[in-house]
Structures are given as C-alpha cells and as structure tokens.
C-alpha cells in the first residue's frame, strides 16, 4: 500500500499563498488614486479587448491584476449583486464597502476550501462628494481587505510603485497631473537595469469615476483625450472640455446608457462597443 504524505495546514496555506503571489506578480501593475475631480484608474494593458478596469455601479469602479477570467467573474458577480440591491432597496444603499466585504468573503472561501486560490488582487473604489469621502479598498487572494488612503498600487512590484505615488500624489491634483503621476509610478519599475520606462498611450487603460457627474460616473479615457493628458506640453493643466467630455452641461446630466457613460474619446457621441 502506498504511503500517503502528510502536509500540515500551515504548509498548505503557505503553498497556496506562494502560488497566488507568483501568479499576480506575472501580470502588469495597476494604480488607483483620488484626484480633485474624482477617482482615477490607470493600468498597463496591451489588450484592447480584455479590460482590467471596469464599472460596477453608479459611483463604484473596479480594477484588478492577475488572472483575467478569475477577476472578471468576480466583477460580474459584483455587478449582479449591486443591481439586485439597487432594485430591491435603493440605489444609495449600494456601497463600495458592502461590495468589498462580499468579494472578501468569496475570496476567503475559495482560498480555504478550494485546492487552488484565485490569483487576483482587486481594488473596489467609490467616489464621494469630496476627495476626503473617496473610498479605496484593496482585496487580496486570501480575502484580506485594507482601506487605502487615497492611493494604491497592485501587482508584483506594488511596493516600489506605491513609494513613487506617495512622493508625488496630492488629493487636489488635476486629472492631467494625476495621470502623469500614475504613469510615472508605473514606469518607475521594470526597466533594464532598474531604469525608468516610457509607457505609450496604447499600452495604458485609463478610466475615471467623475465626481461631477450625476448617475453613472464611470467613463473611459481613450484616444486623443488620453494623448492630450500624457502630452508634456499640457503639464499642470487639466484637459479641455472638448477633449474629455462633450460639455460641462452634458457631464451634469444623468447617464442612462453604457455608451454615454463608459467611453470618452475624440467622438463622445459614438456608443461604446
């Protein structure tokens, strides 16, 4: 009869943690931070079809690193939960904290009960009336939840990126300055010999939760609008309304369709596909 090997619970948990950390470290990093106009998401993403940043509800956004199929399943479950609670009770009852707790319970159960943990790290962000009211929650593969102070980085080199963010981030920054700080932080790691990298616009996925919008606040920043934000000549200046949105009046209107709320680019009237 074959002898069965014994592994202590501590060793099993260490092995699962190591597996999850290695999987997360293989992916590209993402940054989430508060700025004067809302909450900014910036992720390195070479794919135009698979999004690492997305919308969950009116004032709640989602960003993740790791295995796409795993964190996308979590995001979809969060959308269904938020929609159900909003329809059953009130839209104001849907909060980022409640969603973060639900994600934490799911991740914790998978980590302890399944043979393989999810190789993901997640941020749930909720935009508030002011930067002090913004909420950023970090969730790790084992279900741990941390409330982050207005800025956070995810991925294998999150500690080094967070150090750059801590040095340069200010809550009163314009959108243009916030994008530059986020891209600078992402590019500070991964270069040859420890040198900084230059990240092109087509390698970035950028989105915001716009504090000034009513209803759905999530919108993507793409194309010419993103190029303007990354342009060195526009340093220290917020993007013009023609580049970032149709008009200030349009920004104050409630958004009812995914096309009007989800995409920002050179042709705002075109629905997001």
From Swiss-Prot:
Pathway listed: Protein degradation; proteasomal Pup-dependent pathway
Localisation per UniProt entry: Cytoplasm
Domain of life: Bacteria
Listed InterPro entries: Ntn_hydrolases_N, Proteasome_alpha, Proteasome_alpha-type, Proteasome_asu_bac, Proteasome_sua/b
PROSITE patterns linked to this entry: PROTEASOME_ALPHA_2
Lineage: Bacteria, Bacillati, Actinomycetota, Actinomycetes, Micromonosporales
The keyword Cytoplasm is annotated on this UniProt entry: yes
Main function: Component of the proteasome core, a large protease complex with broad specificity involved in protein degradation.
Gene: prcA
Annotated region described as Disordered, given as residue ranges: 231-273
GO biological process: modification-dependent protein catabolic process; proteasomal protein catabolic process
Organism: Salinispora arenicola (strain CNS-205)
Biased composition (Low complexity): 238-249
Regulation: The formation of the proteasomal ATPase ARC-20S proteasome complex, likely via the docking of the C-termini of ARC into the intersubunit pockets in the alpha-rings, may trigger opening of the gate for substrate entry. Interconversion between the open-gate and close-gate conformations leads to a dynamic regulation of the 20S proteasome proteolysis activity.
Protein family membership: Belongs to the peptidase T1A family.
Full protein name: Proteasome subunit alpha
GO molecular function: threonine-type endopeptidase activity
Subunit structure of this chain's protein: The 20S proteasome core is composed of 14 alpha and 14 beta subunits that assemble into four stacked heptameric rings, resulting in a barrel-shaped structure. The two inner rings, each composed of seven catalytic beta subunits, are sandwiched by two outer rings, each composed of seven alpha subunits. The catalytic chamber with the active sites is on the inside of the barrel. Has a gated structure, the ends of the cylinder being occluded by the N-termini of the alpha-subunits. Is capped by the proteasome-associated ATPase, ARC.
NCBIfam families referenced in this protein's UniProt entry, alphabetically: 20S_bact_alpha
The entry's keywords: Cytoplasm, Proteasome
GO cellular component: cytoplasm; proteasome core complex, alpha-subunit complex
């Amino acid at each position: 009869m074959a002898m069965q090997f014994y592994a202590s619970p501590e060793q099993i948990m260490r092995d699962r943690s190591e597996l999850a950390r290695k999987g997360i470290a293989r992916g590209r990093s993402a940054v989430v931070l508060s700025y004067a106009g809302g909450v900014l998401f910036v992720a390195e993403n070479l794919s135009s079809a698979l999004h690492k940043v997305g919308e969950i509800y009116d004032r709640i956004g989602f960003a993740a690193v790791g295995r796409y199929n795993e964190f996308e399943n979590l995001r979809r479950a969060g959308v269904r939960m938020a929609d159900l609670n909003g329809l059953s009770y009130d839209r104001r009852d849907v909060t980022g904290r409640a969603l973060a707790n639900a994600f934490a319970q799911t991740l914790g159960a998978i980590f302890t009960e399944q043979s393989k943990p999810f190789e993901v790290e997640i941020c749930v962000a909720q935009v508030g009336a002011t930067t002090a009211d913004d909420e950023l929650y970090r969730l790790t593969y084992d279900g741990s939840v941390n409330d982050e102070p207005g800025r956070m980085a995810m991925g294998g080199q999150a500690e080094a990126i967070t150090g750059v963010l801590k040095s340069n981030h200010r809550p009163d920054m314009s959108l243009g300055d916030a994008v530059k700080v986020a891209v600078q932080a992402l590019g500070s790691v991964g270069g040859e010999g420890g040198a900084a990298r230059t990240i092109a616009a087509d390698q970035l996925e950028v989105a915001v939760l716009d504090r000034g919008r009513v209803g759905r606040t999530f919108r993507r920043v793409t194309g010419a609008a993103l190029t303007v934000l990354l342009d060195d000549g526009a340093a220290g200046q917020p993007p013009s309304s023609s580049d970032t949105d149709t008009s200030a009046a349009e920004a104050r209107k409630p958004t009812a369709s995914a096309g009007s709320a989800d995409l920002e680019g050179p042709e705002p009237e075109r629905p997001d596909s």
